[in-house]
């Protein structure tokens, strides 16, 4: 049965759920991938990610090629045409195959009467492709970002915004974290080479390896045994500032899916770690990661604004707060972020971050370390957030990350090869 399923129609349905219903691709895609063969899973992912990466270009092309957009019950056809255009523009799929499979997708979504329309639009694009692309190269949509986000990036990063946008529009690299309790990084790289894969180290993060070409996890030496974990280099940077030690009581707040929880335990296997997240469903990923790596932590569901509900009056030696954020630093990994976020979200997120910071600080021991981290590149959530916190918190001191005038360490996507990420290390003064 699996080989009869039309991939293009599944991709169109997934994109419709993201754009029309505001669902996250990471929630929508896995159930659809279960319907197809292993070799087709990667193509389905490529079609979904690719269309969302280039959505504003595909939208512009459809407006040029069609007299009026498809609406209502025909809306899925609109996204099916996008899938067709994406294949013609960005994949090595032979045009005749891309056309035939996309047109056939109309049958799968129960719109067989529109096969001729889909075929006509895609063939018209083939005829006019060169002229259309020349015109699009001058259009404001060419940056493939919504206007509100482009404006914020230009304001925040007047010198670098074009590099950031370009990085956001690329396929992401695949970074791994070698479990130092099993192998040194060099030892594991030798195993990787034996497996026929090539990897590169990171100059700043001692456990990080970037694959020359992304590979499925089952191809990685010892993945199932916990020798290695998929985690972006920038996320690994948290340990440079947290510096966990054996015997300490450590809180990992907003911990799902558990990448940083397990990194803490790799660096300090005898630490007593509590991992907390508000999302019960995502906590299952924390359990999965702990199990694969053979580790133990206290895992709790809880709201970061109300720590007393899940830890009483307890205080911690170190706290890692990976705060909820706009995720504007990981757009290349999650291109749906561009279309799911709204401008108004940024102020709401900044308010939530401030509330969590305030309440969490009360549970840090005097002399203790709190690392505030986000995968955002917007100052409202990062340097401005920390400036405001330092101004209202007399016993907080910035350490090893920036200056009081410009607090925190900001990684941008691209130049550092990792994702966009922000860290601020705060020490609680002793009385």
UniProtKB/Swiss-Prot annotation:
Q: Which family is this sequence assigned to? A: Belongs to the class I-like SAM-binding methyltransferase superfamily. RsmB/NOP family.
Q: Which reaction does it catalyse?
A: cytidine(967) in 16S rRNA + S-adenosyl-L-methionine = 5-methylcytidine(967) in 16S rRNA + S-adenosyl-L-homocysteine + H(+)
One GO biological-process annotation of the entry reads: regulation of DNA-templated transcription
UniProt-annotated binding residues for S-adenosyl-L-methionine: 254-260, 277, 303, 322
Region feature Disordered, mapped onto this chain: 398-417
Compartments, as annotated in UniProt: Cytoplasm
What are its GO cellular component terms?
A: cytosol
User: Which Pfam families does its entry note?
Assistant: Methyltr_RsmB-F, NusB, RsmF-B_ferredox
What does the protein in this record do?
A: Specifically methylates the cytosine at position 967 (m5C967) of 16S rRNA.
Protein name in the entry: Ribosomal RNA small subunit methyltransferase B
What gene, per UniProt, encodes this protein? rsmB
Ligase among the record's keywords? no
Q: Do you know which PROSITE patterns this protein is assigned to?
A: NOL1_NOP2_SUN (PS01153), SAM_MT_RSMB_NOP (PS51686)
């Amino acid at each position: 049965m699996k080989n009869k399923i039309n991939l293009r129609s599944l991709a169109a349905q997934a994109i419709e759920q993201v754009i029309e219903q505001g669902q996250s691709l990471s929630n929508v895609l896995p159930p659809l991938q279960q319907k197809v063969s292993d070799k087709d899973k990667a193509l389905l992912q490529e079609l979904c990610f690719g269309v969302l990466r280039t959505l504003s270009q595909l939208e512009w092309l459809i407006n040029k090629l069609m007299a009026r957009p498809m609406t209502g019950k025909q809306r899925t056809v609109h996204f099916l045409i996008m899938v067709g255009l994406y294949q013609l523009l960005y994949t090595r799929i032979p045009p005749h195959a891309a056309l035939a499979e996309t047109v056939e997708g109309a049958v799968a979504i129960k719109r067989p009467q529109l096969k001729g329309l889909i075929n006509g639009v895609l063939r018209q694009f083939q005829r006019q492709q060169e002229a259309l692309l020349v015109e699009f190269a001058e259009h404001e949509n060419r940056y493939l970002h919504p206007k509100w986000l482009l404006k914020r990036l230009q304001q925040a990063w007047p010198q670098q915004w074009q590099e950031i946008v370009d990085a956001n529009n690329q396929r992401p690299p695949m970074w791994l974290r070698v479990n130092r309790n099993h192998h040194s990084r060099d030892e594991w790289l030798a195993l990787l080479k034996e497996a026929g894969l090539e990897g590169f180290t990171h100059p700043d993060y001692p456990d990080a390896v970037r694959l020359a070409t992304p590979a499925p996890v089952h191809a990685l030496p010892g993945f199932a045994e916990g020798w290695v974990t998929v985690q972006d280099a920038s996320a690994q940077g948290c340990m440079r500032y947290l510096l966990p030690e054996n015997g300490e009581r450590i809180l990992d707040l907003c911990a799902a899916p558990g990448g940083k929880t397990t990194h803490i335990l790799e660096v300090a296997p005898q630490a007593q770690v509590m991992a907390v997240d508000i999302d019960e469903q995502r906590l299952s990923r924390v359990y999965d990661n702990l199990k694969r790596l053979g580790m133990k932590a206290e895992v709790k569901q809880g709201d970061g604004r109300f720590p007393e509900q899940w830890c009483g009056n307890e205080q911690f030696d170190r706290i890692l707060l990976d705060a909820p954020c706009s995720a504007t630093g990981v757009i290349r990994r999650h291109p749906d972020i561009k279309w799911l976020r709204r401008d108004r979200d940024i102020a709401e997120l900044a308010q939530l971050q401030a509330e969590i910071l305030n309440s969490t600080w009360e549970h840090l021991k005097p002399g203790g370390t709190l690392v505030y981290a986000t995968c955002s590149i917007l100052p409202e959530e990062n340097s401005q957030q920390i400036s405001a916190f330092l101004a209202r918190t007399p016993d907080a001191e910035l350490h090893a990350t920036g200056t009081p005038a410009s607090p925190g360490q900001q990684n941008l996507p691209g130049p550092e090869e990792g994702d966009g990420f922000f860290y601020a290390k705060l020490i609680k003064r002793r009385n």
